[in-house]
Amino acid sequence: MRFNPTTSGPAVSTLDEKNLGRIAQIIGPVLDVVFPPGKMPNIYNALVVKGRDTVGQQINVTCEVQQLLGNNRVRAVAMSATDGLTRGMEVIDTGAPLSVPVGGATLGRIFNVLGEPVDNLGPVDTRTTSPIHRSAPAFIQLDTKLSIFETGIKVVDLLAPYRRGGKIGLFGGAGVGKTVLIMELINNIAKAHGGVSVFGGVGERTREGNDLYMEMKESGVINEKNIAESKVALVYGQMNEPPGARMRVGLTALTMAEYFRDVNEQDVLLFIDNIFRFVQAGSEVSALLGRMPSAVGYQPTLSTEMGSLQERITSTKEGSITSIQAVYVPADDLTDPAPATTFAHLDATTVLSRGLAAKGIYPAVDPLDSTSTMLQPGIVGEEHYETAQKVKQTLQRYKELQDIIAILGLDELSEEDRLTVARARKIERFLSQPFFVAEVFTGSPGKYVGLAETVRGFQLILSGELDSLPEQAFYLVGNIDEATAKAMNLERGGNLKK
């Protein structure tokens, strides 16, 4: 389906034309509204409740129609708090689904689920808006060519490459560098692909959302002086929002991303943090709508809801949306219906390891746990595939030997195993990399490493050509030439001390 943004939001003209209903029942964030016979709104239409509460405060609540109940009643889910609403209040049917601003005007700004700016930087140009509900692109529009999405991050490109227009699950706890990795990807896609990014904070902590915004301003991803030069749009539906907002904020972010893909014909990066909270919000709403709970108390429509979001994230002949989704795994149970349903849609998984972060190896991507469907010789080429497999074998052997080393020491290993350990430690350090967005904290200039350079570097380490170099020469460098130059500097420094 082609993207057809409207040139103005869903406006309702004169009072006579307004389709008016009245609130009949309020159950938390769910409202039942009675409309005149023959004037029922459609499913997904936006309804607006305007008026004053008992204290005289202005109320403006937007809801979305979810069910037609019969007897001229509809059931709708509120997108903001329902405090102060009373039975009998007037409800206006806007006659269209929720629409949000799209295009260049959204860059550098923070929006809520309704597409309203919440960053106190003034109004946003709303001449071009688009409804948040659309069908996924038709088969004939899809780009079926399998191609690698180069990120410039060595560990990702070599061992768990991303697919252009694919979906990646990002697994990581607090403090292992998830935010920095997200910001680096936003920075690299802007520089290498000329693309933009959209960040959807679904059920985020308000503090995390604020931290991300501040760090993006500090690192230049959001340009404060010239906001139009920014490379990212942010959409937040925070933890304190009602479930309706958390359930729909992912679609708001996706709609903004689709415009950049279909109209501007760009490669777009879409971040969703956290996809589990999208499911959780749907589960809360489902019970209030009177649906029978399914396995583990989740909504019976779990697969459908997930599919309607995920199937819109794809490559078309115009451009691509590559999505990186943080996945929370409840109680570390991968068989839980929420993560299990998400896994069915993912092309790659990037696992962040607390052990690597503790060693100071950043990005702390676990090279053995991270996987990708793209790592096949037919897609990445024989040379890349062989190198990646040898790197994994070397690191796996090192992992197996670690217990022996801890008890008996390196000297008790065979000559071959000692060599494997030495190369594995070099590989582990060479998988680290200085980031552009961390430059302001570390003082080290960031490095973007092309895929060919990455493969060449690891081939040289595996071949044994660099066995004589000290392992610290490989730590936090870009390509392999920088590692050899660093080794010479270390040697020179050592000679000077003597």
UniProtKB/Swiss-Prot annotation:
Catalyzed reaction equations: ATP + H2O + 4 H(+)(in) = ADP + phosphate + 5 H(+)(out)
Single GO cellular component term: chloroplast thylakoid membrane
Any Pfam family matching the protein: ATP-synt_VA_C
GO BP term, pick one: proton motive force-driven mitochondrial ATP synthesis
Membrane topology: Peripheral membrane protein
UniProt keyword annotations, A-Z: ATP synthesis, ATP-binding, CF(1), Chloroplast, Hydrogen ion transport, Ion transport, Membrane, Nucleotide-binding, Plastid, Thylakoid, Translocase, Transport
Listed EC numbers: 7.1.2.2
Protein localization: Plastid, Chloroplast thylakoid membrane
Family, as annotated: Belongs to the ATPase alpha/beta chains family.
Role, per record: Produces ATP from ADP in the presence of a proton gradient across the membrane. The catalytic sites are hosted primarily by the beta subunits.
Protein name: ATP synthase subunit beta, chloroplastic
Gene: atpB
